[in-house]
């Protein structure tokens, strides 16, 4: 006898396919609904300009990179990384690997090269177990690594956008970002599901 989906997973699938942003992404042949989250952030915060260099962490399936390419143009460059594979996007240099591993970080830094990065963006998230006591520390570890990446490659006055799940450690993390950047906003894009604990911290004016 085949296994049945749980009530919660069936409910998630029903919500997913009813979601207007999922439908829009499908109609427009976009990689994911995350495209619209970054678009909304760009309309408000103006992170991207033509010719910029961008690092995209947790890039797969490619919604953020796909959007950023439209903003930075052919003279810009995106260096993207994810533990999962991602179909190629013109203008995106993709590295598959676990960003938590030193060897992957070094390979990513090698691809960045001597260029200073204008925007670091992170949509990284762990595989969730459903246990907040486990999931939140895992998620916070990833966003701390993303902030460390800023310290290594971000140009003065550069920008950082990161998905963060509200919970233990969030306030301390926000305080750290405010110490490093001139302007820091917490955004909840319309394309983010209401019941999700995710928010996006948008930080501009890196103090270097």
UniProtKB/Swiss-Prot annotation:
Belongs to the class I-like SAM-binding methyltransferase superfamily. RNA methyltransferase RlmE family. It comes from Actinobacillus pleuropneumoniae serotype 5b (strain L20). Specifically methylates the uridine in position 2552 of 23S rRNA at the 2'-O position of the ribose in the fully assembled 50S ribosomal subunit. It comes from the Bacteria. It is found in: Cytoplasm. The active site is at 163 (proton acceptor). S-adenosyl-L-methionine binds at residues 62, 64, 82, 98, 123. GO terms for cellular component: cytoplasm. InterPro entries: RNA_methyltr_RlmE, RNA_MeTrfase_FtsJ_dom, rRNA-MeTfrase_E, rRNA_MeTrfase_gammaproteobac, SAM-dependent_MTases_sf. This is Ribosomal RNA large subunit methyltransferase E. It catalyses: uridine(2552) in 23S rRNA + S-adenosyl-L-methionine = 2'-O-methyluridine(2552) in 23S rRNA + S-adenosyl-L-homocysteine + H(+).
């Amino acid at each position: 006898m085949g296994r049945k989906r749980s009530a919660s997973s069936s409910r998630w699938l029903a919500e997913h396919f009813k979601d207007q942003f999922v439908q829009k992404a499908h109609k427009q042949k976009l990689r994911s609904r995350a495209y619209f989250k970054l678009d909304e952030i760009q309309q408000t915060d103006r992170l991207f300009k033509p010719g910029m260099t961008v690092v995209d962490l947790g890039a797969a399936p490619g919604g953020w990179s796909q959007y950023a390419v439209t903003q930075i143009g052919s003279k810009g460059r995106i260096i993207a990384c994810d533990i999962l594979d991602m179909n190629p996007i013109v203008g995106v240099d993709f590295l598959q690997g676990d960003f938590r591993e030193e060897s992957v970080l070094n390979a990513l830094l090698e691809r960045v090269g001597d260029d200073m990065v204008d925007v670091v963006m992170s949509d990284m998230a762990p595989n969730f177990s459903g246990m907040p006591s486990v999931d939140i520390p895992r998620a916070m570890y990833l966003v701390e690594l993303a902030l460390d990446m800023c310290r290594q490659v971000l140009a003065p006055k550069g920008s950082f956008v990161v998905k963060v799940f509200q919970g233990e450690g969030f306030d301390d993390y926000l305080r750290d970002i405010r110490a490093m950047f001139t302007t820091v906003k917490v955004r909840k894009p319309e394309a983010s599901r209401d019941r999700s604990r995710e928010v996006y911290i948008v930080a501009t004016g890196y103090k270097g």
